[in-house]
Amino acid sequence: NHTITKYIKDAHFYDSTASIEDINYNPDRKLNRSQMEELATNNYIERGLNIIFVGASGCGKTWLSNALGVHACRNRKTVLYIRLPELFSKFEEKRIQGKYNEYLKRLGKYDLLIIDEFLLKPTNESERSDLLELMEIRCNKKSTIFCSQYSFDGWHQLLDGGPIADAILDRIINSSY
């Protein structure tokens, strides 16, 4: 179907061939099959819930997020895959072009936003502000998948602690799987 092909192309997946039917449930991966089957219903998207995948580099977070994203596209959901460093660069570029608010609104409209390489390094003030605005516009309305090498416990420090970190994490965690 042309529409689904376009949805998948427009999502800019790292791996557009990833498929939920091909998920490897090897016990070493510690994937909960029933939870993955629940995610495959796309109910989390309908409810505006987030997903957080945490694990070491190379363990399959990106592939898994892309499999869920491709599945969402097949169900006519709009999806965007982007790495956090790339997202921060885009925010800066749009700010310079005077199109920041327009870009933020567009990001707020995707049914599913997949943010890979989430918080690989500490953030600066501008990045934290951008992240807060993005989470505010999506919170409880649209779903976001976060792929990170660091567990949630380390995120607060990578966001420089304090009230902005609290606000960002509150919007992510309180509506997450």
Regions found by a protein language model. Give the residues of each.
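N-terminal pre-Walker A segment at the start of P-loop NTPase domains
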Residues: A18-N42
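Pre-Walker A (Motif I) flank of P-loop NTPase domains
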Residues: I45-I52
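Conserved hydrophobic/aromatic pocket- or pore-lining residues that grip, position, or stack substrates
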Residues: I23, S65, R83
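Non-DNA-binding regulatory cores of transcription-related proteins
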Residues: N42-N43, K141
